[in-house]
Amino acid sequence: IRRRNFIPPDKFPYNNQIIYQDFAPLIYDSGNYEPALDKAVELIGYHQFIQEEQPRLRAAGKHVGIGIVTYVEGTGIGPYEGARVTIETSGRVSVATGVGTQGQGHYTSFAQIVAEQLGVSVENVRLTTGDTAEFYWGAGTFASRGAVVAGNAIHAAAVKVREKVLKKAGEELEVAIEDLELVDGLARVKGSPETAIKLGDLAARANPMRGAVKPGTEPGLEATDYFGPERGATASGVHAMIVEVDPETMLVEIKKYVVVHDCGVVINPMILEGQIQGGVAQGIGNAFYEQLHFDENGQLLNASFMDYLVPTADTVPTILTDHVETPSPLNPLGIKGAGEAGAIPVGPLFAQAVEDAFDSVQLEILEIPLSPNRLFALLQPGLAAVA
């Protein structure tokens, strides 16, 4: 049923007829949902599980279930972000942007965007984030918008600096701009690598100490630019999970977990992998462990990690991941956000897989967290009915 009701790729952009959190109509910019589902079905071994493994395990008295959940994530909302990119006389590149960073990998992924435009190594790009002394315009890091909005602002500024570099290098080397390339911190002539000039030297020469600056130009190799998306980009994906539930303790063990994600063009696969895995871990906490308890006076009873349960290394499974890339038409980099992709579908996925594990019982799970005592209580009416 889900496969039959997917929005076809040729129907995008697709108006969802509701208002999104940025107070604009929710319009899905792009997507290709069926390949993601196909990959998830293959990675989880869906057909083999339901045809062979699940019947065998159930015959042995095991309560095993499988779940598959698809989702769409709204990302990359406005209003805007900005950035400044500067090539210093040392040849290093400094970048400043208003967004903050809390471990998303900005220092690597944003540096990659600049390095690709200017032909320098990532190690030679110095990034400053969230410092109003360096760059004071910006909205912030939230709602899976950092890479989409700030990343494209950085890209726009880097493109402007690239244009300045090529223009200045063409003047210094007396060649046409189209005959130049930026490689290894050099502006050099294509096919004649010995005819080159360092970017640091160009930066020094772009700041004349004598004479007038040429009309239509400005000193230095620096640019500031901003990016404000027309609307948010929509990422998507599929999570699949196989679980086993102990009927005595009601503990849920995750036997296999699969994520297939589409966030458009991927900047850094390793960082994306970490984002997804961290989100899944948080989602597992939401689905099975984390809950605040209060007494009749409103006093919080589990205010420390001694008694507030969170997932640990031995309860978070190995997560198999794969990707589908459907570029967003809303920004030059073609990217979509990934900050919440790991967490969004985990609760419904838990509910679906656990319901399947008790298929002989009329079990309907409508809320999380699904702690053992809550699962026990939910099962009692159904168990009594089949007793």
Please state what every model-predicted region is.
Residues R2-P35, E42, H47-A387:
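Cofactor-binding beta-sheet edge motifs in enzyme active sites
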